[in-house]
Structures are given as C-alpha cells and as structure tokens.
C-alpha cells in the first residue's frame, strides 16, 4: 500500500532537543504519475517538519543521470518542490550546505557552541555543549567546516541503477537498492570521504511512527575500519539515517572538517 509520509503520526523525541535536523523526502517513495512532490525542512521528530529548509542548495538526478537545480518553495513549516517524473526509474534528490561549527574551551573542555534560548540548562559539567550566552571575548574559540548532505530516492515504474553523485561530500554505496528494502534483509552501506574509507563514523537510525503510542525504534552503530556499516531493519516504515563524523575527545582542539549526511529511506515489505 502506498503511504504518504506526511500523513503519518509521529511521537519520537529527538536525541538533541536543542536543534532541528534537516531532511528531504518524497511525498511517496514509489510514484506513478507525471509529477510528484518533494518536501524538505528542519524537524525534531522524524519527517515532522516544523521549519522550512534554508541554507541548502538542492539538485535532482533523473534516472538517466541528468542533473538539474531543484528550486523549493517555502511556507512556514516546510519547503516543497514539484518534480516532473516523465521517465521510469530512480530519481535522486540531494541538498547541500557548508557551515561553520563553533567550539569554545571552558574548563579545558572543547564544547560546541549552540544558540539555544533555553534558560534552564543543566550545569556545564553535565552538558556536552555551551550556549552563546556563556561565551565571551576571552573564551578560546575555534571554528571548523561542516559539510551537510540531505538525500532521498524515489522510483517510478521500476528501480534503476543509482547514478554516481560526484557532488556528494560523503560517498554512499548500497548493498540493496534504497527503494527495494525488505524486512530482516541487512542493508550494508559503504562510506567514503574523498575516496578514503570513512571509518568510525557515527550512524543513527530513527523510525517514523505509524500510530500513537508506538515504541521508539532507534539504532546506533559506527562504521568499521573499511567504512562499512550494517543496518538490520526489522519493521516496515520510513526511516531517517544520520551519518556523521567521529566524535573527538573534549580535551582535543577540533581542527578537521566534519561531515553529516541525512538519508530518508522507506521499507515497504
């Protein structure tokens, strides 16, 4: 049965309550008509957009590999794009941005600086971040670049070989086509950055709820020394897969670029 993502009810509480994560997803992962819609936004709950996307440049790859810019129209809670689907096969959507991530050193700990409005924060010793209000001109600070990709796939009529996207900051290789996922069939994703295996990358999987009161499904793992990560998805439904650079020790000054890729997937059977 076809299921529109935004008709589903979700109740998963995000791990990071101080920020909304970006995502992009089709209105349906399997389409039949000549046009479909793609949604993007910032959300705390999987697929539950609260703020329209901003800061990202989006591109569409059609089944033949042709790439074109994908403009999105914003309303307050979400952004939407119209996609012509005249060809059969798999379409890829990718949004990209580059941002500065600021860290500050306090009590010999390098902590990420977050612009949070929360005035009832836990003591600093119990947090892994620092607020803008706690930083002053005498506080040692450093910035690194973070490269964000948001990616999704949908197919018309049939799935087709994924077009290699040379623009992706984090290269992804799938053991199973993203639109052909099946229950209890392991999904192996090969991760690479600039041609080198992305080892020890953090991977978190969140499942969209289908009904009120449904238990949260959250999986966490890391990529191995060859950049492979194995995901065992045991329930049908829509998933957000977040892949990010390894964490650095708080006493170590951040110097390297960091990467985050957020993928929207669906398992229908």
Residue positions per predicted region:
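Positively charged n-region of N-terminal signal peptides that target proteins for export
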Residues: 1-4
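N-terminal signal peptide c-region/cleavage motif recognized by signal peptidases
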Residues: 14-16
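Start-of-domain marker
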Residues: 20-81
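Beta-strand-rich domain onsets/edges
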Residues: 20-36, 121-187, 192-201, 209-213, ...
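Short amphipathic beta-strand segments in non-cytosolic proteins
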Residues: 59-67, 202-220
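Glycine-centered loop-to-beta-strand initiation motif
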Residues: 76-79, 87, 219-237
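Short, aromatic- and glycine-rich surface loops/edge beta-strands on solvent-exposed regions
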Residues: 89-101, 238-245
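Short acidic/polar inter-strand loop motif in beta-rich domains
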Residues: 97-109, 247-253
